[in-house]
């Protein structure tokens, strides 16, 4: 027997089932194996002997809850496990005790036998027989436990000193007591376990659990009824086997066993069934939106989740789906999408508006720069040209007149360049406004040819041919059409040394290719400018051009332009539109083919040699092309070098509708009175004749266009229509031989006496000056009348012109008109004063608007010539004060309060009693160097009657006074 002891595992914690004092005496003798971890079950099974207090309400609350039910079920299972485990452990302990008892008895028997053997064999060898070997071996034959593996290979070794009978007797008694205590404890545990099981069965909350389930089911139904959904199950044939329908339209018995086709009809049913079939075929769930429109519940949108249902074998046996009504959400979603689209559109519009505003600001700055340039150049140029005209009326020798002629021509060239640049800038920036008026194409062609003939120095024939299908009157922008014709005729005359120059006007049978009229609007594919032409036209009658505005409330209407209230660029369905084709041809030097592509570009000419030899700025044709495209037409050229050129443009024009009450020719508005034979003539020819003598004027013909009172054209006096030869060597040959010579046209110009040869010639010179001045803005020719008429003696004096100015003066001083000149520039004051004095009128001069108001308060005037830009108070503000007083009889202090102290007071009212008494409207004529039409519109809006652009000449002043002054 060895001294080794069994090693006790450190990680094993076991509670001994033996009494606590069992090892006190023999702790030093034996090292016994501790029981396994299964012994913990016995410890867990201990119950308190003392009853404890229980909160029954809390217990019932926990038992009635879902968690309590779960815990109760777990508790029952746990106690069943504990009971089984305890019984097993007790059986194991009892078996072990029995085995140990048997070993003790065997040991006891061995001891007795050994004692007897020793007595019998005193002299024999004593063998030591281990008394516990069989017991130890039998010990490990018992059923093994899970915690007994630690002691399988260990042997119990007992010291020899403890191998005595008394020890084992005592040991056996202790084991007996321990076994009895264990059995008693087992019986106690069994009793308590049975008691707990009985208590658990008697207190099982079956009714509470049933109530909980009912409440949960009710709550589930309540949730489903509150949610707008449909839950259903369909079999493989898509027949309903279960459905919970939120919508009370159908009962369950109306749905169960039927398909969707048997229940509903309308939009969306077939689509949903196809998706269900796809889910069953693919075995994959899906979510879709379906739009239904059925007679049962109307238009609805559902979002549906569909999933397949599988059997145990994996076959698809149906589908489950959940559908929710999202009609309101879809409506809100569409509204939100619409709002987002609107916001995007609004943002794009704001961006575009910002860009347009930026472009507009840039355009306005450029336009303001051009206006400033025009004003700054025109102001000193006005002094030069006006003083030159005044100087031409004085006594000068031949050389002085020639120098003066060069001065006037050069000044006119500078003025023409300014006008071309301004016209081009207005067209390109979109500021050019086209205004529709009713005019007569024949008169326009005839007047253009007359003006060209008046300034012609070459042996050329000017001819015009008007087609029979051309209407007598059409509606269009007559000023721009005349500007285009004049520019083309001027170029033709300039580049033609011999032969003829002519205009051919006719109506096209078909409209221009690439252009169409849809919805009353003109469209052009070839040009982008005509498409926007309607935006540049005004519905108001023409009141002004680039230089002069006329008041529409005067009876002196234009002879060839009749105001119209229709927009030029807008053609209504009932309007008749004709396409006029105008060909301007010549037999001149022609244009090289390589130069044709560059012909209509700005500042470009056929060649540098042409530019040096013939002059010009290269802007005329560019302006013509843009004006034609702006009016919705096209401009083309056909030319062959050394054979001539033909410029052709096509324009849409509307035929004016005659009113029923205007059948009488006398009531119909006309530019020259009633229709005559000359109004419908089809051709004009201006042929050169012998040069009788020279007549010079010293006054430039090609000056800026000056239109007073809306007179866009001036019909020349009868000297141009009576087949009598002109003094400049040209005669008008007409196709009609009757009634043309006797027809007399009324005009705003001075009457011509046919009995006085000198007056006849002088009147013709002035008339040609007037005609030429009106088209100078569209031409580059700066030739004056003094260079048009030749004499056999060569250049001579201009005493006839001077005598004409002297005769035009008002001889009786008592009939002088009282004129107020409001001007701050000393040079302009000198010019206007000199011209008015030569015309025989008195003049008062003030330097700003405030002084003008003081002068009007003290004296009555027949006409006021007022500058626009002046210090202290400009002409526009002063005009508003004057018009306000004329309308109300008192000075309106609300127009500009800061000037109240100057125009208020009782003295002022008494001083102006003459104006209030007569109720007279004093004509106010604007005089400014700003040639933009917006400036003219501002003048008219302020109350001015007309507009004269600087530089001012005798003809402007004279026409203005003739129109607005009362007859002397």
From Swiss-Prot:
Coiled-coil annotated residue ranges, if any: 89-120, 169-204
Residues carrying Phosphohistidine: 375
Stored SMART domains: HATPase_c, HisKA, REC
PROSITE patterns in UniProt: HIS_KIN, RESPONSE_REGULATORY
Location of the region described as Disordered in the Swiss-Prot/TrEMBL record: 737-757
Annotated S-S bridges: none
SUPFAM superfamilies listed in its UniProt record: ATPase domain of HSP90 chaperone/DNA topoisomerase II/histidine kinase, CheY-like, Homodimeric domain of signal transducing histidine kinase, PYP-like sensor domain (PAS domain)
Polar residues compositional bias, start-end: 738-754
Keyword terms of this UniProt record: Coiled coil, Cytokinin signaling pathway, Kinase, Phosphoprotein, Transferase, Two-component regulatory system
GO CC annotations on file: plasma membrane
Domain Histidine kinase: 372-655
EC number: 2.7.13.3
Catalytic activity: ATP + protein L-histidine = ADP + protein N-phospho-L-histidine
Entry domain remark: Histidine-containing phosphotransfer domain (HPt) contains an active histidine that mediates the phosphotransfer.
Function: Cytokinin receptor related to bacterial two-component regulators. Functions as a histidine kinase and transmits the stress signal to a downstream MAPK cascade.
The name this protein goes by in its record: Probable histidine kinase 1
Organism for this UniProt entry: Oryza sativa subsp. japonica
């Amino acid at each position: 027997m060895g001294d080794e002891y069994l090693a006790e595992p450190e990680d094993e914690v076991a509670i001994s089932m033996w009494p606590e004092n069992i090892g006190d005496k023999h702790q030093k003798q034996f090292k016994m194996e501790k029981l396994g971890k299964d012994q913990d079950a016995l410890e867990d099974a201990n119950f308190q002997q003392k009853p404890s207090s229980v909160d029954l309400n809390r217990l019932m609350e926990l038992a009635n809850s879902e968690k309590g039910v779960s815990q109760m079920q777990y508790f029952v299972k746990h106690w069943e496990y504990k009971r089984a485990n305890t019984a097993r452990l007790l059986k194991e302990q009892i078996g072990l005790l029995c085995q140990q008892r048997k070993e003790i008895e065997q040991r006891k028997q061995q001891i007795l036998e050994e004692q007897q053997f020793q007595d019998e064999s005193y002299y024999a060898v004593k063998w030591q027989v281990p008394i516990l070997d069989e017991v130890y071996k039998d010990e490990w034959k018992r059923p093994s436990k899970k915690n007994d593996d630690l002691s399988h290979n260990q042997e119990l070794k007992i010291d020899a000193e403890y191998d005595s009978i008394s020890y084992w007797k005592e040991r056996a008694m202790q084991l007996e007591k321990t076994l009895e205590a264990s059995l008693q404890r087992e019986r106690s545990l069994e009793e308590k376990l049975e008691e707990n099981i009985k208590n658990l069965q008697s207190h099982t909350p079956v009714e509470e659990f049933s109530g909980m389930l009912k409440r949960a089911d009710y709550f589930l139904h309540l949730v489903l009824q509150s949610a707008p959904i449909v839950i259903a199950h369909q079999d493989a044939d898509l027949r309903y086997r279960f459905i919970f329908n939120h919508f009370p339209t159908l009962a369950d018995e109306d749905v169960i066993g039927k398909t969707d086709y048997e229940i509903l009809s309308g939009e969306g049913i077939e689509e949903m069934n196809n998706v269900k079939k796809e889910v069953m075929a693919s075995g994959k769930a899906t979510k879709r939106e379906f739009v239904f429109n059925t007679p049962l519940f109307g238009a609805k949108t559902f979002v549906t989740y569909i999933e397949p249902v599988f059997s145990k074998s994996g076959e698809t046996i149906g589908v489950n789906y959940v559908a929710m009504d999202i009609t309101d959400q879809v409506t809100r979603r569409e509204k939100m999408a619409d709002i987002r689209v609107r916001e995007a559109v609004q943002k794009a519009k704001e961006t575009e508006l910002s860009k347009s505003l930026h472009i507009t600001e840039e355009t306005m700055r450029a336009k303001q720069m051009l206006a400033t340039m025009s004003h700054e150049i025109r102001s000193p140029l006005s002094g030069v040209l006006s003083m030159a005209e005044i100087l031409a009326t004085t006594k000068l020798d031949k050389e002085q007149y020639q120098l003066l002629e060069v001065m006037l021509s050069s000044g006119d060239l500078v003025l023409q360049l300014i006008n071309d640049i301004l016209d081009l800038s207005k067209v390109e920036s979109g500021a050019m406004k086209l205004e529709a008026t009713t005019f007569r194409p024949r008169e326009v062609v005839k007047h253009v040819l007359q003006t060209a003939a008046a300034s012609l120095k070459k042996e050329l024939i000017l001819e015009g041919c008007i087609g029979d299908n051309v209407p007598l009157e059409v509606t269009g922008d007559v000023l721009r059409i005349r500007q285009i014709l004049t520019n083309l005729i001027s170029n033709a005359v300039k580049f033609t040394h011999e032969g003829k120059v002519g205009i051919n006007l006719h109506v096209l049978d078909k409209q221009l290719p690439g252009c169409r009229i849809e919805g009353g609007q003109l469209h052009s594919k070839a040009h982008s400018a005509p498409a926007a032409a309607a935006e540049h036209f005004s519905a108001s009658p023409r009141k002004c051009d680039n230089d002069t505005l006329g008041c529409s409330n005067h009876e002196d209407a234009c002879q060839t332009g009749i105001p119209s209230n229709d927009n030029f660029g807008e053609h209504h369905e009932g309007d008749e539109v004709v396409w006029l084709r105008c060909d301007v041809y010549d037999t001149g030097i022609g244009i090289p083919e390589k130069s044709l592509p560059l012909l209509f570009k700005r500042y470009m000419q056929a060649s540098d040699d042409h530019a040096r030899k013939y002059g010009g700025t290269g802007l005329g044709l560019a302006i013509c092309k843009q004006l034609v495209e702006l009016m919705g037409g096209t401009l083309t050229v056909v030319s062959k070098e050394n054979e001539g050129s033909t410029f052709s443009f096509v324009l849409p024009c509307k035929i004016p509708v005659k009113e029923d009450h205007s059948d009488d020719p006398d009531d119909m508005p006309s530019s020259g009175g009633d229709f005559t034979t000359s109004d419908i003539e089809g051709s004009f020819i201006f042929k050169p004749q012998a040069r009788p003598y020279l007549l010079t004027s010293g006054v430039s013909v090609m000056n800026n266009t000056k239109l007073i009172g809306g007179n866009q054209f001036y019909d020349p006096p009868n000297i141009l229509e009576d087949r009598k030869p002109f003094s400049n060597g040209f005669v008008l040959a007409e196709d009609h031989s009757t009634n043309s010579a006797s027809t007399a046209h009324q005009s705003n110009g001075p009457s011509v006496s046919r009995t006085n040869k000198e007056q006849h010639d002088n009147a013709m010179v002035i008339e040609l000056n007037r005609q030429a001045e009106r088209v100078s803005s569209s031409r580059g020719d700066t030739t004056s009348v003094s260079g048009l008429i030749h004499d056999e003696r060569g250049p001579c004096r201009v005493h006839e012109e001077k005598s004409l100015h002297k005769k035009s003066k008002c001889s009786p001083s008592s009939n002088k008109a009282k004129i107020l000149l409001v001007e701050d520039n000393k040079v302009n004051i000198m010019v206007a004063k000199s011209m008015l004095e030569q015309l025989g009128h008195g003049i008062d001069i003030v330097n700003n608007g405030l002084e003008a108001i003081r002068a009007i308060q003290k004296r009555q005037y027949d006409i006021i010539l007022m500058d626009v830009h002046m210090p202290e108070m400009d002409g526009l503000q002063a005009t508003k004060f004057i018009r306000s007083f004329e309308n109300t009889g008192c000075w309106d202090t609300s127009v500009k309060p800061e000037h109240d102290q100057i125009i208020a007071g009782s003295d002022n009212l008494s001083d102006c009693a003459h104006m209030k008494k007569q109720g007279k409207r004093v004509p106010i004529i604007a005089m400014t160097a700003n040639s933009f039409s917006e400036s003219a519109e501002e003048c008219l809006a302020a109350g001015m009657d007309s507009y004269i652009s600087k530089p001012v000449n005798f003809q402007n002043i004279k026409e203005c006074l003739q129109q607005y002054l009362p007859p002397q």
